[in-house]
Design a protein with these regions (language model features):
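HTH-adjacent hinge/linker in prokaryotic transcriptional regulators
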Residues: 1-43, 47
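Short charge-dense sequence patches
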Residues: 1-5, 22-30, 72-77, 127-138, ...
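Generic structural signal for well-ordered, non-membrane alpha-helical segments
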Residues: 15-22, 26-29, 45, 70, ...
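Context-gated lysine
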Residues: 17, 24, 35, 57-60, ...
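Glycine-rich phosphate-binding loops that contact phosphosugars or nucleotide phosphates
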Residues: 53-181, 187-194
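Internal, active-site/partner-interface "lid" segment
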Residues: 192-218
Length: 218
């Protein structure tokens, strides 16, 4: 598990056949996931998980901010976290982001997701969250302006996600998968730290959802 995994990003070419595209896209994703498994900073995850779990236990707000592709990840995060019985929201409109961040308080968590780490809207959110005393959990590439705002303070956590990707030729794919994986890690770990009555609630949700589906054929 701890062995190094060589990362080889194979760019998709215009003359690639369909079979080549399938192999390259899947290989790039698998390679990036394995590399991140070995590179992920467990101490940063521990800080983020602790802050999120404490916010969930105390009824504080957990808000996910993203724009564009990262807004889709934010929506996925909200979908996962609200099922844990916590106050979770995904905010993707830049004006609403400013308003919501302004209402943050100490103990609240603002999870800011960005592929480039250079979105002006999200940099504004990070600055407002810092001023309001909320915990900022930043999921972005290291060395970016947003990453710098996720470091250096007791209420600032950086979950760095680095990956080579050709943004000019196609929409970022590997980055989205890595961000979704980070959300899955956070959700799983936070669920294990929430009170014991969570499990019956999750079972009831599954039971009620089954009523929304057609029965399987005999």
């Amino acid at each position: 598990v701890n062995e190094g995994v060589p990362f080889v990003h194979r760019a998709v070419d215009e003359d690639d056949k369909t079979a080549d595209i399938i192999v390259k896209v899947i290989d790039n994703a698998v390679s990036a996931l394995l590399k991140y498994r070995n590179d992920a900073a467990s101490h940063a995850f521990e800080r983020a998980i602790t802050a999120l779990a404490e916010a969930g236990k105390s009824g504080k707000r957990i808000e996910f901010y993203g724009v564009g592709n990262s807004g889709i990840v934010a929506a996925d995060a909200q979908h996962k976290f609200f099922r844990l019985g916590v106050h979770a929201a995904a905010i993707v409109d830049s004006h609403v982001q400013v308003m919501s961040a302004t209402m943050l308080e100490p103990g609240d968590c603002a999870v800011i997701i960005s592929n480039s780490g250079r979105s002006r809207d999200l940099l504004d959110v990070a600055e407002i969250a810092r001023r309001k005393g909320a915990t900022s959990i930043v999921i972005t590439t290291s060395g970016s302006p947003l990453a710098q705002m996720g470091q250096g303070g007791a209420t600032q956590v950086l979950l760095a996600v680095d990956h080579p990707e050709d943004y000019d030729r196609y929409s970022p794919m590997v980055s989205r998968l890595l961000h979704l994986m980070v959300i899955d890690i956070l959700t799983t770990a936070v669920a294990l730290r929430l009170p014991g009555e969570l499990r019956p609630m999750l079972q009831e949700i599954k039971k009620n959802l089954r009523a929304k589906r057609y029965a399987r054929p005999e």
